[in-house]
């Protein structure tokens, strides 16, 4: 039997079945198939020992995500020298207690953090095709994800207060320092460029000359932020936000980044050039999704253990 336009019903049914199976895999398996990415970055002074940095990003915690909570808790077993949290911790305003429980063991380590839009505001239902439409139109998310009228305001202050109480440094449009095994590591952070909360003018001026390493930290890797950090001479920039593309095509990669960063650098370690300088850039694919699109394909959720080593 043939359906309209001469397409056999068996073919139509087969395509539908494959699509359904893919959706089940993307939501039921891959979105919960947590991985640890390991990278080495040569940015430390000569003669220093390696430093282990755990980057956690885009947790997007939803109530009831027991497997994610257990996996995040297990990361403390890596015994990092410090933790960097690059934001978007929530996708459910009622999940703050579970988020803090999941991150509890990591809060025992030194750390720094910035927030993303989903820390401040609850997610809104959005047609996933809009990401592709914005890319085709050349907007690439440049208008940001400014909260719509009626958006849920998260109790983000509870997260901030818990992080601060643990000793983590709040890098919201400001600077901070950690001392790690005798090394002075300076950080400069920005609030989320995706909703235009970044204020680079407050922190401009380049790395601190008496620090052994200076690191730029931001949630969304918009080019204006990457350009500013790099042109000022920061050797390392850490970001999240992109979800690695979230729905990728095998052997091709990501279709979108949800910002103006190119898809070749949607996740992992790369470089960025601006103002005559080159910086190492690490973009985390994150370990969560929006509660309204709880799927990943060819892009498993992850955290990253960065081993910082002496420069060549």
Locate predicted features.
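Active-site neighborhood of phospho(di)ester-bond hydrolases with catalytic His/Asp-centered motifs
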Residues: 54-57, 82-88, 111-117, 171-173, ...
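Active-site environment of divalent metal-dependent phosphoester hydrolases
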Residues: 61-66, 90-94, 118-125, 146-147, ...
């Amino acid at each position: 039997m043939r359906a309209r336009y001469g397409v056999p019903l068996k073919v139509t049914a087969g395509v539908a079945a494959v699509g359904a199976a893919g959706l089940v895999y993307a939501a039921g398996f891959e979105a919960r198939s947590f991985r640890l990415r390991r990278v080495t970055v040569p940015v430390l002074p000569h003669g220093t020992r390696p430093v282990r940095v755990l980057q956690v990003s885009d947790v997007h915690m939803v109530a009831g995500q027991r497997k994610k909570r257990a996996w995040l808790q297990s990361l403390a077993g890596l015994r990092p020298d410090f933790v960097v949290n690059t934001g978007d911790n929530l996708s459910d305003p009622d999940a703050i207690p579970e988020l803090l429980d999941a991150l509890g063991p990591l809060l025992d380590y030194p750390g720094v953090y910035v927030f993303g839009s989903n820390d401040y505001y609850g997610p809104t239902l959005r047609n996933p095709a809009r990401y592709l439409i914005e890319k085709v139109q050349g907007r690439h998310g440049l208008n940001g994800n400014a909260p719509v009228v009626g958006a849920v305001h998260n109790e983000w202050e509870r997260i901030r207060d818990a992080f601060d109480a643990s000793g983590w440094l709040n890098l919201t449009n400001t600077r901070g320092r950690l001392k790690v095994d005798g090394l002075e590591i300076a950080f400069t952070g920005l609030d989320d460029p995706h909703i235009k909360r970044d204020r680079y003018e407050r922190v401009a001026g380049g790395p601190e000359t008496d620090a052994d390493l200076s690191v730029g930290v931001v949630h969304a890797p918009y080019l204006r932020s990457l350009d500013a950090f790099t042109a000022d001479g920061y050797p390392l920039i850490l970001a999240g936000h992109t979800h690695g593309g979230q729905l990728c095509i095998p052997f091709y990669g990501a279709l979108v980044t949800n910002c103006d960063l190119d898809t070749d650098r949607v996740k992992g370690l790369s470089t960025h050039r601006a103002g005559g300088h080159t910086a190492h850039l690490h973009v985390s694919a994150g370990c969560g999704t929006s509660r309204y699109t709880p799927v990943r394909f060819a892009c498993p959720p992850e955290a990253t253990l960065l081993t910082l080593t002496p420069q060549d």
